[in-house]
Amino acid sequence: MMIAALLAVSLALPLASRAATSPSQPNFGPNVYIFNPSMPQSQIQAAVDAVATQQVSNQFGTQRYALLFEPGTYGTSTTPLTFPVGYYTSVAGLGQSPGDVVINGSIDVYNQCLGSGCVESNNFCFNTTPPGTPQVNCNASDNFWRSLSNLTINEVNNSALGCEGAAEFWAVSQASPIRRVLVNGLVTLFDFCSGPAFASGGFIADSQFAGSTVINGSQQQWITRNSQLDGWTNGVWNQVFSGVVGAPAQCFPGSLPACGNNPYTTLATSPVTREAPYLYLDSNGNYNVFVPAVQHNSVGTTWAAGPTPGSSIPIQRFFIAKPTDPAWLINAALLFGFDLILTPGVYNLDQSLVALYPDTVVLGLGFPTLIPQNGNPSMIVASDKGVLLSGIIFDAGPKNSPVLLQVGLCGICHNSHSASDPSGIYDVFFRIGGAEPGKATNSLVVNSDNVILDDIWAWRADHGNGVGWTDNTANTGLIVNGTNVTGYGLFVEHYQQYEVIWNGNGGTDIFFQNEMPYDPPSQAAWMEAPGIDGWAAFKVANNVTSFKGYGIGSYSFFDQGVNIFAANAFEVPNALPPESLNDLLTIFLSTSGSGGILNVVNGIGGSSTIANPDTPVTVVSYP
């Protein structure tokens, strides 16, 4: 019916006009800013500052931006280009390699200060009276939905900014990745210029940090994958390194004398990776999207010894969608074989977007946000092979959706041929409530085999709009039915039943961060089964015979004033091979909470309650 309707419409002209026909300058819309080195630096500075002023406190706004830099050098050691990055802002170089775009200066994320209801910039509130009054309660725990990629930063100490001109600051929490970045100079992952500076990140991949030790500081947890370090200062609860040159040595739990309270989970190589696709300009000034090749047992960056292996797709093969485009038009483009670029904005979808064909690329610029309007999934990936999705937010809509993103049509139809050309989901984030009321039974369902999940945050909102136990309802953040699925950096929080269900064999998860729901109104309302309190955060199905997990943590903060308990943070088959799970932990987050987690995994490991707040309860390996 849908295909017949589409074919009945004269589509050739609209599609041709919306596919990129000008190699020099495709129309990415008004919220994609493209800078080049010939522009006056004052003009660039004014533009990026204006975006930051709007976005730095715009947590649940509808504005979205991409700031793109053509190959060349920006700023100098005496006149650095320095600017903050706010919500829903992606900053990226347009070179084929990170060294093609050089920023002399810094691109920063600072704490937000909540002392007087306003947001901090350079350690002071924008609208403080009198000007310059220091703020209190400054932290990075809500610094979400922003990104930095594909460029080099030569960090320049900018004395005009005071303390916050002393480093490259990336004080973020979830959904704020760094990819394909080289930083020469001091990098800090927390803002030490104002306190208490809590931070709850984070994700780095395919990046290098040279000339200084990366400051982890207060970051509770972090995953760094396939990168190169000159040093790393410390751990807090769950710092994970996979395929990282210069990573700290394996040391878990942090309470061991040899660890010095620095817990590190370190894997020498990453089992299977495929870096995220990215937009770039070639030497002839033509736009392309680069698709990196699959790697096995890899270590370090893909660009250390030359250009990243892979292939290019010319921009003419992409349909460049705008938020005002109807879903049928975007689907028509996908039906006719176009790849898809989603430009910044909010897309209200009255039907699911369907990626039909193998090797389709769907690339988001500036955190495009998809919201289903009729209880439909926002997107269905129909092919099991080589489909890549990157840089997209999936919001729940006003009518309950069974799932927001479905990857693969059949959870029991296994396809080994996809192993050489796996699908990948990169920097894809899910949200139930917060920005607006919404409901969805499940957020992400992966039916295809061999899929790579690379930085996923599925969040049932604990603050914002439409938040409440019976308001933003959502059972499960991630269900994996496919075999040999690999996850790096899975952040899944506050769902109302199992937060992750892993049904497929041969799976691997490297890093998991979870907060259980804050708001169960009673123990009776939150029971896995009679006699089993609560729900496990991560459930490996009873019929699974092979699964590996590394660096997996779950935290509790039940804030309804009644004792709520979860019997286990993790439930897995006892028949898994020995040491299938490694470096597990639970945390009781705050003495203002109640209840807690009674066991780490399958009835062992001890409890996290008010008796041991902010103290990891650990299991080194299981079974």
Residues of each region from the PLM?
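Eukaryote-biased recognition of C-terminal alpha-helical segments
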Residues: 593-623
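Right-handed parallel beta-helix/beta-solenoid
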Residues: 20-46, 295-327
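Right-handed parallel beta-helix/beta-spiral solenoid domain characteristic of secreted/periplasmic
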Residues: 28-42, 88-164, 318, 323, ...
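Right-handed parallel beta-helix
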Residues: 87-96, 140-156, 175-187, 199-211, ...
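Glycine-rich beta-solenoid repeat tracts in large extracellular/virion proteins
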Residues: 80-84, 99-142, 159-174, 187-198, ...
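N-terminal extracellular ligand-recognition/capping segment immediately after the signal peptide
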Residues: 33, 37-90, 96-108, 323-329, ...
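Fungal secretory targeting signals
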Residues: 1-18
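Extracellular/surface-exposed low-complexity segments
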Residues: 240-310, 623
